[in-house]
Structure formats: structure tokens, C-alpha cells
């Protein structure tokens, strides 16, 4: 049974609030340090402001000038506005530079269409006429364009698996994310007794595979959509609803450690060597 849309929206808001707060706490250390940092052997004083923005661009995996940011202090002053635009709330939302409103809506529709059509081609024959994208996921896709997880972008991109890379096809063509039941059995790593009729891999990352699988435990059970995560460090996680996924995923591989200013290095941060 699908979750009510209001429950999905509330769980997403709680997820975003938690991750935003954690990232803001880290940026309250990084931003003031970078705003006054001066590298060794600076040849031109006029370059330092550009270096500071470059360092923040690397930390946040973005181009701050595209967002109208010209001074490091604006990141904290405008945090609530900027967080969803650069993924500091753990989501991906397409921005204006990625197309007009109509073009972005078309990208979203294309993602769902291609996934569903591929499911009907690659799933077990006895479910091909009835299989469709789970309503929970469709509701989530109406609110954001991706769910990418915990941490500042530069660190998250290296070490944190994304639950859903989103509507972009630059990482992998959408149809390529949909797998045959045989391939999903290995990818999702469900117990051998489980049966998989179809599904897809919305996201992945270091030592972790996310899967959305149409599955059942035995012939007597009905087919259900489930969200799974198979990892080396956390084993296998199985969820039946998006609110459960978001509540767990918000804390997945969470680290509360924030460096002190004395642990930061100006050259490393300003020259994008993080």
C-alpha cells in the first residue's frame, strides 16, 4: 500500500531539515576560514577573492557565480535559499541553468516514462502488463529530482552512495538502470528464497547498491515494490515505503565530526586540493 502524499512530503521535509542542519554546522567552520584565508606565496592580492570562491566551489561542487554569490559570507546569510539549489539538504533539484521550466518538466516526465517502458520490456512475462512505477516513488519524484544523501558535496560525491541519482541521464541512460530479474537478484543481494519480477537501480556508490524491486518472498505472497540497499558495512536493508527509506537514509554513514579551524589548511582549500 502506497504512503499518503502528505506522509511522503513530511518525511522529505524532515530528511532535508536534518541534513541541512548538519551541513550548516560544518559550513560555519569552513566559510569563515575560507573568507579570510590567504595562501602561501600569493603573487597578486587581487587573486585572493577569486581563489576563495574557487575553494568554496570545490567544497560545494557548484559554481557560486551562477547563483549570484560573490562573497563567501553570502553562503551562510542565504543558506536557506541556497541549500536546496546546491544539494546541501541532501536532494537534487534541477535549476534554471539546466533548462526552462517546461524543459525541466519534460526531463522529469521522460525519466518516469523511460523507466516504466523499460520495466515492461525487462520484467517477468507474467507481470509485464501490470507492472508500473510504485506510487511512493512517483510522489517523491514530484517533489525533488534526486536524493543524494548526507554530507558536504565534495565529500559526499566521493564516499556516499546516492539513493536516487535523479532525472539526469549523464551518469547512465535511464533505460540502462532497469535490470532483468536475473541481474537484479545479484545487484540487490536479497536472500535466495526471494523472487524478483523486475525493478531498477536508482542509485549506487562506494560499496553499496540501491535497488527498487518488484518482489515477493514465496509463490504464495503477492508481488510488492520494495526499496533495498546492499552494503559491505551495513548489510542488507529492506523498506516498503519511501518515508521509511528517508528516515533511515538521512543517517546512513553519518559523521558528526566537524574540523576545528586549526585543522584546516588555506592552501588545500583555496587551491581545490581537498
What would you call each of these model-derived segments?
Residues 123-127:
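Exposed regions on extracellular, virion, or secretory-pathway luminal proteins
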Residues 138-141:
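Hydrophobic alpha-helical bundle cores within soluble ligand-binding/oligomerization subdomains
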Amino acid at each position: 500500500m502506497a504512503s499518503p502524499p502528505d506522509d511522503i512530503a513530511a518525511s522529505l521535509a524532515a530528511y532535508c531539515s536534518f541534513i541541512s542542519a548538519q551541513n550548516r554546522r560544518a559550513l560555519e567552520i569552513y566559510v569563515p576560514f575560507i573568507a579570510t584565508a590567504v595562501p602561501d606565496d600569493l603573487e597578486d592580492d587581487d587573486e585572493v577573492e577569486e581563489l576563495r570562491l574557487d575553494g568554496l566551489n570545490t567544497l560545494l561542487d557548484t559554481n557560486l557565480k551562477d547563483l549570484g554569490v560573490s562573497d563567501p559570507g553570502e553562503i551562510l546569510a542565504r543558506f536557506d535559499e541556497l541549500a536546496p539549489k546546491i544539494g546541501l539538504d541532501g536532494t537534487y533539484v534541477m535549476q534554471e541553468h539546466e533548462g526552462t521550466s517546461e524543459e525541466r518538466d519534460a526531463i522529469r516526465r521522460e525519466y518516469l516514462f523511460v523507466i516504466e517502458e523499460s520495466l515492461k520490456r525487462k520484467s517477468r512475462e507474467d507481470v509485464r502488463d501490470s507492472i508500473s512505477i510504485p506510487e511512493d516513488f512517483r510522489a517523491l519524484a514530484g517533489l525533488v529530482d534526486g536524493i543524494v544523501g548526507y554530507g558536504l558535496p565534495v565529500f559526499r560525491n566521493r564516499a556516499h552512495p546516492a539513493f536516487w541519482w535523479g532525472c539526469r541521464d549523464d551518469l547512465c541512460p535511464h533505460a540502462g538502470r532497469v535490470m532483468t530479474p536475473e541481474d537484479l537478484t545479484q545487484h540487490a543481494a536479497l536472500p535466495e528464497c526471494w523472487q524478483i519480477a523486475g525493478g531498477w537501480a536508482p542509485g549506487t556508490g562506494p560499496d553499496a547498491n540501491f535497488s527498487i524491486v518488484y518482489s515477493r518472498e514465496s509463490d504464495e505472497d503477492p508481488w510488492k515494490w520494495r526499496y533495498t540497499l546492499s552494503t559491505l558495512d551495513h548489510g542488507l536493508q529492506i523498506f516498503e515505503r519511501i518515508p521509511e527509506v528517508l528516515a533511515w537514509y538521512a543517517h546512513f554513514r553519518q559523521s558528526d565530526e566537524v574540523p576545528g579551524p586549526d585543522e584546516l589548511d588555506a592552501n588545500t582549500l583555496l587551491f581545490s586540493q581537498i
